Amino acid sequence: MKNKYYPLRSSMDEMSAKNDNEIDLEKGPLPEYNSEDGSTLPPYSEIWKYIKTVSEDSSTGPTETTNPNVERRQEFKDSHPNIYSLLRLLISVLAVIVVFFTAWVCVNPLEKSIFGKVAFFVTIGITCPILLITIFCFFETWTQAVAQCIKVTVIFLAQCVKVTVISLAKCVKVTAISLAKCVKVTAVGLYNSREKWVVIIWLLWVVICYTLFLRSKFGNLNLNKALICSTCSISAALLLFLLYVRLPFWTLKHMFSGLFQVLGVQSCVVIVTKGLMHLFDKHIDATGYEIEASSLFVIGNFLFFYEMECPGALRRMPKSIRNGIASFLEGTGKAIRGANDNNNNIPLEETEAESEV
């Protein structure tokens, strides 16, 4: 049996073979189609029509995205042409007026000279009409440019403000951290240098207070409320510094707690002193203020030495005061209950005998 060779032919070849002798009068004769090449398609085939349609659609389609602001402006222009023209004219006139007043302010100092007058009339007679025509004709172009410029400027200013705020926040944070570290290092250094610096500061405070007392007693310095407030502040600041030095492990809450305790004790002394002075019908003169200042001075020294000898005593003071008050109230209650129990335990016979008598 002999093998027969049949050349491979596509469906396109068969269709072209059938239509070799058929000529369409409208389309003209078909060009030769090479199936081996495959680069060209029959011009009247369905595939060719589809490719042509797709290419036309892609070529005629929109290639750029339009701006919505431009679309709205175009719609307004098409729907209200007269109003749009009036707006263009009004904005153009306003722009020219701004330019005119700017030129007038610049030329006004030179109006006394001939050059100034000529420049002013040239600006009015030539520049302003040309500028008005230019602005009116190129209204859309320069308005878009101005809007874009304003937008870029606003964004730039917002970025500048944002960067400035962030930088300031970082600077404040770094400064606070640096100050806290400096205070910590100073406190630790003073704590490691034993107690000599604390004693030196205390002695300096004593000298200042005694100087104020002597000046007020024998000099021309009147001892008044300002000195009392300064004494309170000095003693409170001393205690606060003492807490930094002696107790570096304290937190800020504990430091301010000790500060308020000292101020509270000093305030109580001042109130009691004033109350006693008014009770005995004596005015608070220099002697009364001297008593108050001396009392505050003694209390400040007492708290200083107490904290030096017993570190953390002021921290335990509120608890001790609460325990003392609770113990006092509890003892008073027990005493009252004991008295009532003794009255209830009296024998009935004794009460009857007393009633008979």
Curated annotation (Swiss-Prot):
It holds the Pfam family WTF. InterPro entries: WTF (IPR004982). The chain crosses the membrane at residues 89-109, 119-139, 149-169, 198-218, 232-252, 256-276, 286-306. Residues 11-29 have a biased composition (Basic and acidic residues). One of its GO terms (biological process) is meiotic drive. One of its GO terms (cellular component) is ascus epiplasm. The keyword Transmembrane helix applies. Residues 1-39 are annotated as: Disordered. The keyword Cytoplasm applies. Keywords: Cytoplasm, Endoplasmic reticulum, Membrane, Toxin, Transmembrane, Transmembrane helix, Vacuole. Promotes unequal transmission of alleles from the parental zygote to progeny spores by acting as poison/antidote system where the poison and antidote proteins are produced from the same locus; the poison component is trans-acting and targets all spores within an ascus whereas the antidote component is spore-specific, leading to poisoning of all progeny that do not inherit the allele. Homomer. Forms protein aggregates. The two isoforms can interact with each other and with themselves. High sequence similarity is required for their interaction. Belongs to the WTF family. This is Meiotic driver wtf9. It comes from Schizosaccharomyces kambucha (Fission yeast). The lineage of its organism: Eukaryota, Fungi, Dikarya, Ascomycota, Taphrinomycotina.
